[in-house]
Amino acid sequence: KQEVTQIPAALSVPEGENLVLNCSFTDSAIYNLQWFRQDPGKGLTSLLLIQSSQREQTSGRLNASLDKSSGRSTLYIAASQPGDSATYLCAVRSYNQFYFGTGTSLTVIP
């Protein structure tokens, strides 16, 4: 069974820092991996989608890497801003199902 783990569970950093959020999964048989953000009281917003054949994706200040063989994905956030404060979730698509991590709650302090 696929299990997805995210560390750290919570992170508080000063504005301007570069951040690293980690996601690990137990089964390398994945179709794709997706990073989302969730703002309080709102639904999920898709940030980056990495197909299993790809190594990374970039969008603005965000970069996500995927190492399927070691079961890891990393989300890098450059020059963090207070508006980046949210819960970040990693989801792996395996066996026609989505498996979500428990998320990392990020607070960026101005």
Question: What residue spans do the PLM features occupy?
Answer:
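Extracellular domains of the immunoglobulin superfamily
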Residues: 1-110
